[in-house]
Amino acid sequence: MAITRKNLFGKLDATLFKGIESATTICKLRGNPYVELIHWLNQLWHQEDNDLKHIVRYFAVDVDAFERGLAQALARLPVGATSISDFSYHIELAIERAWVYASLECLDTRIRSGHLLLAMLTNMELRRALLAIAPEMEKIPLEHLSSDFNFITQASPETNEAATDGSPMYDGTLPGEASNAINGKSTATLAQYTTDLTALAREGKIDPVLGRNHEISTMVDILLRRRQNNPLLTGEAGVGKTAVVEGLALAIVAGEMPPALSQVSLLTLDVVALSAGASMKGEFEARLKNVLDEAMASPTPVILFIDEVHTLVGAGGNAGTGDAANLLKPALARGQLRTIGATTWSEFKRHIEKDPALTRRFQVLQVDEPDEDTAISMLRGLTPALEKHHGVWIMDEALQAAVRLSHRYIPARQLPDKAISLLDTACARVAVAQFSQPAELQQLTFQSETAQTELSSLEKAQHFGKGQDERTALLEATIAQHSAAANKLEQRWQAERELVTAITATRTVLYELVSQPTPDEEKRQQYQQQLAQLEEQLLLIRSAQPLVQAEVNATVIANIVADWTGIQVGQMLKDDIRAVMELPQRLEERVIGQPHALVQLSENIMTARAGMADPRKPLGVFMLVGPSGVGKTETALAIAESMYGGEQNLITINMSEYQESHTVSSLKGSPPGYVGYGEGGVLTEAVRRKPYSVVLLDEIEKAHSDVHELFFQVFDKGQMEDGEGRFIDFKNTILLLTSNVGSELLSNLFADPDTAPDQDGILSALQPELLKVFPAAFLGRVTVIPYLPLQQSALQHIVRLHLDRIGQRLQSQHQLTLQYSDVVVDDVVSRCSVAETGARMLIRYIEQNITPEIGKFILRDHDAIPNQIVFVDKVENKFTVSVLNEKINN
């Protein structure tokens, strides 16, 4: 009968066991694949005292030569292994021969390092291995050592040591297993490389999963098949593929599954752990095969969940060699192993779909991003866990704001993942604010310290006659101002903290009270009154910007989105109805001289927002027709800012780049087999990432007719199929198409304002011109809005607007106020021909003739006193810039 390792290693005394334990650690650190004799001898030699050292000293072995031999032997070992495969054959042989010598020759009950050395000198195979490491050991006479062993080692600490298996601390663990330097052989592969989701569900360690009943039911249908019973969950990162599997585990534990699935164990495979340390060819595949064999042989039915299943394709080696997916195929096809896979759609197309044999063994189950209502329900299921973790109260308005704002302003991620991250961050911010100083107070403290540092430097310079009295006085005033503001803010923060702490405690007591089967009504009313009083006190000491929040609300959510995106909080919290109602006013402020066009645009968008338009179509599809420079692009910018929170939500496509028919693929994405497949299209990817946006198709008349036809599905159904077969949703976008078709006709019609036609007449006159470029089917799907040539009053207004913008820059940069005469405005308008370039010529003229004069004035008189008036005038055909005598009072 073979001797077990447990019994063999248990006979080592404490010195030898510690030595081989540290030898396994050194072996792993050096990257050696096996624990060798050299590791053990090296560690024994570096111990403070033992039999080995007494024997070496007794026989006068050259210590320097012995240590050089150890170092050289270690250097000769192969390196590069990420884990230890096992103990070498020589280790086990040496222990076995040492035990024979100790028990039979020395009548001892444990193995000492001296016994180990005797065994290595006695056995010819071990002797060769020892002398290869340390040739100096040949000087030790075997007979002398054997006969005088007890005398030579009488002072060794090993004399009084017992065998390891005689210690109450010994549990049969092999050397290296306790420190994880070497993997134990007794651990089941299935338990080592998987996590039991059903066990976690029983222990309450999985959060509730809501809103995925359809996906779970479909997955159960697939799992109950006799063959090819393997669902493959595909969907964008963050839509909740893993949560669907966790929902299945919860349903199994809750007894909501049919009998065939009621007793199964749902195990998730850790692919990273499976591949970690698999340095030798075939080791990864061997581990995976052991997992599959144990799963199929398990007495309890097992369903294996492989997240990121595409990592198994090619994971075991290069393409065509040892592909781990090939190990899965037979078991999956025969139905012996039920497997749930999960991967993103792009990874599925890139890796799995290319292997038809693997693809047909899975049934693809698409997990789509939930709508806003479903996502809110999902967050409600997570609310108790978040409240318990952070110790805060989450209002329902915070859940709605997290979903709505993340859906609109964080388009790069998916619901519910981004809403959960947003809500989790909000909870953390509210919890932290109760213990750390607010950002405003920290900023004031920093500014005060910065000013104090500069003041100290100036005071030092003053001793050397280099003082700056004005700067010193300014810094002293700044420090005093910041200190006063910081003290005031500190007091308010402390007061808010105390009240919020009291409110939180009262809410906790009140919640525990009402949770009782028969709550005390009198106490409930008492605590409710106390809570109302505390909240009223908090409102009294607060300003518009609270320093400490008593709960997670919509304002906290909006502040975090503002930090992440840079969009103003007010614009995010503004509801859609108010944004639509303010749209006409916003457009009139930015787009000058187009009242009829703006009214028509506003009315159409209002109709769509009221739900009266076809819900399958985009919010609006408008073709803005007119000369260049009359406000078409500015209209798109104004709508993006008013309706979608900022100009960053404007997607601009220059259609002059799509004059050939083959350029259609760059808009929607290349089809399979073509260069660029899988990278997405310019338009489809932009809308997929920003579903709430204005899409500006500039100079649409220059695009190829095939490109025009591409948009028919967008105009009719509000969606476009990209090159990968995904449908991109355009229902929340506003499409603006700009065109210069009919510009000359419009200029002629409005050459004389008295004979200009009305709006219907303009459209009738434009129709023949448009039909020369666009087919009737295209024009029938868009709303044509003519943009008229700008009149004199509109041009003057535009000039004043641009000069006012220059004045704003002057005020912010130099604290100077800009004024200008009417002569300047009239001169700019009279000198610019706007027939072909529109308002762009006016702006270019101002930037070429007026702005340089202001710039030279600033550089020449750079020490001009702040708060003065800079006046621009036209004198003798030349623009002049001067300072008025009067000064603006703050």
Curated annotation (Swiss-Prot):
<dbReference type="InterPro" id="IPR004176">
    <property type="entry name" value="Clp_R_dom"/>
</dbReference>
<dbReference type="InterPro" id="IPR019489">
    <property type="entry name" value="Clp_ATPase_C"/>
</dbReference>
<dbReference type="InterPro" id="IPR027417">
    <property type="entry name" value="P-loop_NTPase"/>
</dbReference>
<dbReference type="GO" id="GO:0005737">
    <property type="term" value="C:cytoplasm"/>
</dbReference>
<keyword id="KW-0346">Stress response</keyword>
<keyword id="KW-0067">ATP-binding</keyword>
<dbReference type="InterPro" id="IPR001270">
    <property type="entry name" value="ClpA/B"/>
</dbReference>
<keyword id="KW-0677">Repeat</keyword>
<feature type="domain" description="Clp R">
    <location>
        <begin position="9"/>
        <end position="150"/>
    </location>
</feature>
<dbReference type="Pfam" id="PF10431">
    <property type="entry name" value="ClpB_D2-small"/>
</dbReference>
<comment type="subunit">
    <text>Homohexamer. The oligomerization is ATP-dependent.</text>
</comment>
<dbReference type="GO" id="GO:0034605">
    <property type="term" value="P:cellular response to heat"/>
</dbReference>
<feature type="region of interest" description="Repeat 1">
    <location>
        <begin position="12"/>
        <end position="77"/>
    </location>
</feature>
<dbReference type="Pfam" id="PF07724">
    <property type="entry name" value="AAA_2"/>
</dbReference>
<dbReference type="InterPro" id="IPR018368">
    <property type="entry name" value="ClpA/B_CS1"/>
</dbReference>
<feature type="region of interest" description="NBD2">
    <location>
        <begin position="567"/>
        <end position="789"/>
    </location>
</feature>
<dbReference type="GO" id="GO:0016887">
    <property type="term" value="F:ATP hydrolysis activity"/>
</dbReference>
<feature type="region of interest" description="Repeat 2">
    <location>
        <begin position="87"/>
        <end position="150"/>
    </location>
</feature>
<dbReference type="InterPro" id="IPR003593">
    <property type="entry name" value="AAA+_ATPase"/>
</dbReference>
<dbReference type="GO" id="GO:0005524">
    <property type="term" value="F:ATP binding"/>
</dbReference>
<feature type="binding site">
    <location>
        <begin position="626"/>
        <end position="633"/>
    </location>
    <ligand>
        <name>ATP 2</name>
    </ligand>
</feature>
<feature type="region of interest" description="Linker">
    <location>
        <begin position="370"/>
        <end position="566"/>
    </location>
</feature>
<feature type="binding site">
    <location>
        <begin position="235"/>
        <end position="242"/>
    </location>
    <ligand>
        <name>ATP 1</name>
    </ligand>
</feature>
<dbReference type="InterPro" id="IPR017729">
    <property type="entry name" value="ATPase_T6SS_ClpV1"/>
</dbReference>
<keyword id="KW-0175">Coiled coil</keyword>
<dbReference type="InterPro" id="IPR050130">
    <property type="entry name" value="ClpA_ClpB"/>
</dbReference>
<comment type="function">
    <text>Part of a stress-induced multi-chaperone system, it is involved in the recovery of the cell from heat-induced damage, in cooperation with DnaK, DnaJ and GrpE. Acts before DnaK, in the processing of protein aggregates. Protein binding stimulates the ATPase activity; ATP hydrolysis unfolds the denatured protein aggregates, which probably helps expose new hydrophobic binding sites on the surface of ClpB-bound aggregates, contributing to the solubilization and refolding of denatured protein aggregates by DnaK. Affects level of invasin and motility in Y.enterocolitica.</text>
</comment>
<dbReference type="InterPro" id="IPR036628">
    <property type="entry name" value="Clp_N_dom_sf"/>
</dbReference>
<dbReference type="Pfam" id="PF17871">
    <property type="entry name" value="AAA_lid_9"/>
</dbReference>
<dbReference type="InterPro" id="IPR028299">
    <property type="entry name" value="ClpA/B_CS2"/>
</dbReference>
<keyword id="KW-0963">Cytoplasm</keyword>
<dbReference type="InterPro" id="IPR003959">
    <property type="entry name" value="ATPase_AAA_core"/>
</dbReference>
<dbReference type="InterPro" id="IPR041546">
    <property type="entry name" value="ClpA/ClpB_AAA_lid"/>
</dbReference>
<feature type="coiled-coil region">
    <location>
        <begin position="420"/>
        <end position="544"/>
    </location>
</feature>
<protein>
    <recommendedName>
        <fullName>Chaperone protein ClpB</fullName>
    </recommendedName>
</protein>
<feature type="region of interest" description="C-terminal">
    <location>
        <begin position="790"/>
        <end position="890"/>
    </location>
</feature>
<keyword id="KW-0143">Chaperone</keyword>
<keyword id="KW-0547">Nucleotide-binding</keyword>
<comment type="similarity">
    <text>Belongs to the ClpA/ClpB family.</text>
</comment>
<dbReference type="Pfam" id="PF00004">
    <property type="entry name" value="AAA"/>
</dbReference>
<feature type="region of interest" description="NBD1">
    <location>
        <begin position="171"/>
        <end position="369"/>
    </location>
</feature>
